[in-house]
Amino acid sequence: MTQRTLGGTNRKQKRTSGFRARMRKSNGRKVIQARRKKGRHRLSV
């Protein structure tokens, strides 16, 4: 029996929480704006 690992897939991660995915929605743009304001080095995944 194979063991199920909890390693995520990069494509799914990028599609849901990548920069371009964030810019598509108005709330996503708010997230980017808030992270810029806070001075985050990484704005998105």
Swiss-Prot record:
InterPro entries: Ribosomal_bL34. GO terms for cellular component: ribonucleoprotein complex; ribosome. Residues 1-10 have a biased composition (Polar residues). Pfam families: Ribosomal_L34. The keyword Ribonucleoprotein applies. Keywords: Ribonucleoprotein, Ribosomal protein. Residues 1-45 are annotated as: Disordered. Coiled coil: none annotated. Residues 11-45 have a biased composition (Basic residues). GO terms for molecular function: structural constituent of ribosome. This is Large ribosomal subunit protein bL34. It comes from Crocosphaera subtropica (strain ATCC 51142 / BH68) (Cyanothece sp. (strain ATCC 51142)). The lineage of its organism: Bacteria, Bacillati, Cyanobacteriota, Cyanophyceae, Oscillatoriophycideae.
